Amino acid sequence: MPKFGKVSRQRLSTCDEKLQNIANEVIKHVDCTVLCGHRNEKDQNEAVAKGHSKATYPNGRHNAYPSKAIDLAPYPVDWEDYERFTLFAGFFLGIAKMMYPDTKIIWGNDWDGDFDTKDTNFRDYPHFEIRE
């Protein structure tokens, strides 16, 4: 059974308890890595500068503490395998819905949560966030 490494566990610990619980269930079935949890102002500005985020500090879900967002990717990470990210997102969202049916979780390739990715203009494949 896969498990999170030390760095992933540290990043995960900065996230909302629901995101931690979902990720801890997902890792039991699919090997994955936590790329990002909470982002401070410097990290958020850097993410925007690199084109990894459009939200400026303190407006990003990663900027809350605990973080209302997590960047989680199937391991090993292959940034060119978009289908794998999509498959992984479906698994993550399914686990999330089973665990927290009344919590809206949004994936970074379906920002409006309508299961239509063709209307997305900013693709952030490893990103999941809680919308309340």
Question: Residue ranges of each PLM-predicted region?
Answer:
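Amphipathic repeat-derived elements
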Residues: 1-9, 38-47, 57-65
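Active-site acidic/histidine clusters and adjacent loop/turn architecture
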Residues: 1-33
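Short amphipathic alpha-helical surface micro-motifs
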Residues: 14-17, 51-55
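Intrinsically disordered, low-complexity boundary segments flanking structured domains
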Residues: 19-23, 34, 55-61, 93-94
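Extended, low-complexity, intrinsically disordered C-terminal regulatory tails
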Residues: 24-54, 98, 108-110
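Catalytic cores and adjacent binding grooves of peptidoglycan-active enzymes
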Residues: 59-132
